[in-house]
Amino acid sequence: MNEDLKTRRALPGAVAGRNVFRREGEYWMIVYDGELHRLPDTVGLRYLAHLLQRPGQQVPAVDLAGAVPTPGGPPRTAAAELARVKATRSIRAAMHRIGTHNAPLIAHLRATITTGTYCAYTPDPRLPVGWEF
């Protein structure tokens, strides 16, 4: 069976006309632009959900990746760089996976997600997108 489950069918009444980014066990239910997709859970999808829940907020990659320096661990600057790389790679991988299924959603995410030392979801205020989680 294909690891990425793509479902194009009539949407359940509960999500019709809505945008959904919701974890359901080992999968994520993603609905955007009338298309329903179920993707296996990944760290990148978790990071994206975290950002989508905080539109307009800059989230430090260290917080997003859960990288907290520990005594005897790498210096804070090294931990911050590792977190930045981990967050960026994970988010890009998740976006690539989404892009193979839903062109309108990946176009939206490419225009609104930034990664780096700080990561953010910054939707255009003139084109609001509401999400259910």
Predicted regions and their residues:
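Intrinsically disordered, low-complexity protein-interaction/activation regions
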Residues: 1-133
